[in-house]
Swiss-Prot record:
The lineage of its organism: Bacteria, Bacillati, Mycoplasmatota, Mycoplasmoidales, Mycoplasmoidaceae. This is Probable tRNA sulfurtransferase. InterPro entries: Rossmann-like_a/b/a_fold (IPR014729), ThiI_AANH (IPR020536), ThiI_fer (IPR054173), ThiI_N (IPR049961), THUMP_dom (IPR004114), THUMP_ThiI (IPR049962), tRNA_STrfase (IPR003720), tRNA_sulfurtransferase_ThiI (IPR050102). It comes from Ureaplasma parvum serovar 3 (strain ATCC 700970). Gene3D superfamilies: 3.30.2130.30, HUPs (3.40.50.620). The keyword Endoplasmic reticulum does not apply. GO terms for cellular component: cytosol. ATP binds at residues 180-181, 205-206, 264, 286, 295. Belongs to the ThiI family.
Length: 390
């Protein structure tokens, strides 16, 4: 009996009107993550997807890949058989090992015309297993093995252990955002969380050579590739902005404590213009409220005021550092993020950054320079390069 992979959809099942589009996007994303596996067959159902023709592949590796795809509730190894009791019983036996264990059977009928009801299916399959496997015992409360039987209109599906999927919504179903990506821990995690809500992403990062090194940029590129799993989770581009000219001019402002605030205001201005040009509907940052001096409410308001109500998403706003680090390890970005290469913000930070900036003071400081806006225009038009992550 040949196993198949059986996938149950996640939240998208709730979206009645948009179900067809949601499933279409999810199936496309699954095919992308499994693109290296040839000759697989995908059978799309109302609330499930079956993947067959798996004989030549490592099922564990395929399942590990599928666990990264947003929109999947759970994944399992299953058997698809004819709607004959004897076939269903044999499929149940595939999950039995040669050692003592407890089990329980659950059954559900989509096809109510099947000649046995759910209770009868459970009883007859359990009796068959007990007769053929003397080490088995029934435990309906805390079984070591739970066998699920689903009677469909065209077949029966039998599966055991459920492997939790990434849940969320299929990437690409909810538009596009531009992520301000640094080399730190937070923004890569923010990227994945925003993808979980069905948003596809591009990245922008800011470099300040010679103050930042090529290794720092290489680290950011590696992070972008890990976030997107080499562009299998979403087709993303990384835009690299050489910010050195602006940074050098901002260094001359009269209030050193506002240096980071002004730098971030220009980050936002550049990111907004780029977002509009790449048809992104929002910016995404890795800010977490109160985590560092520049991430207070006043600071966020002062920095975001340059955007004229362009949407900024901050998925980490209520997370503490330990939670963010835990997620970074889950997404395999943590070890890259802690590589010792400084980014623009860390190198440029004053000794005592203001935690209580205001819009009026920031705007007045920007007006001190007669050339700041001209340099900003030059940087946006001449100092941004695009890196394809594929």
């Amino acid at each position: 009996m040949k196993p198949i992979i059986y996938i149950k959809y996640g939240e998208l099942t709730l979206k009645g009107k948009n179900r067809t589009q949601f499933i279409k996007v999810l199936v496309h994303n699954i095919k992308q993550i499994l693109i290296q596996y040839q000759n697989l067959t995908y059978c799309v159902g109302y609330d499930n997807l079956k993947i067959i023709n798996l004989e030549n592949y490592n099922l564990k590796q395929i399942i590990d890949d599928l666990k990264e795809v947003y929109g999947i509730a759970f994944i399992c190894i299953a058997y698809q058989v004819d709607k004959e009791l004897s076939e269903i019983q044999l499929a149940c036996k595939e999950f039995i090992n040669d050692y003592e264990q407890t089990f329980k059977i659950e059954a559900r009928r989509s096809d109510k015309s099947f000649k046995y009801n759910s209770m009868e299916i459970k009883q007859m399959c359990a009796a068959y297993l007990l007769q053929n496997s003397p080490l088995l015992k029934v435990d309906v409360h805390r079984p070591q093995l739970l066998i699920n039987i689903e009677i469909k209109y065209d077949c029966a599906i039998v599966y055991g252990h459920k492997i939790m999927g990434a849940k969320g919504l299929p990437v690409g179903i909810n538009g596009k955002a531009l992520v301000l990506l640094s080399g730190g821990i937070d923004s890569p995690v923010a990227s994945r969380l925003i993808m979980k809500r069905g948003i596809s992403i591009d990245f922008i990062t800011f470099i300040t050579p010679p103050h930042t090194s090529q290794k720092a940029l290489d680290k950011t590129i590696a992070l972008a590739k890990q976030i997107t799993l080499d562009n299998k989770l979403t087709k993303a581009n990384l835009y690299v902005c050489n910010f050195t000219k602006l940074q050098d001019e901002i260094a001359h402002i009269s209030k050193e404590s506002y240096r980071i605030t002004l730098m971030r205001r220009y980050f936002m201005r550049i990111a907004k213009r780029l977002a509009i040009s790449v048809k992104a509907n929002a910016l995404v940052t890795g800010e977490a409220l109160g985590q560092v001096a520049s991430q207070t409410l006043n600071s966020m308001q002062t920095i975001s005021s340059v955007l004229d109500n362009f949407l900024v998403l901050r998925p980490l706003i209520a997370y503490d550092k330990e939670e963010i680090i835990s997620l970074a390890k889950r997404f395999n970005t943590y070890e890259l993020s802690i590589l010792p290469y400084d980014d623009s913000c860390s190198l440029f930070a004053p000794k005592n950054p203001t935690t209580n900036p205001n819009v009026q003071t920031a705007a007045k400081l920007e007006e001190e320079s007669l050339v700041l806006d001209a340099i900003y225009e030059l940087v946006y038009t001449k100092e941004i390069t695009k890196i394809n992550l594929s």
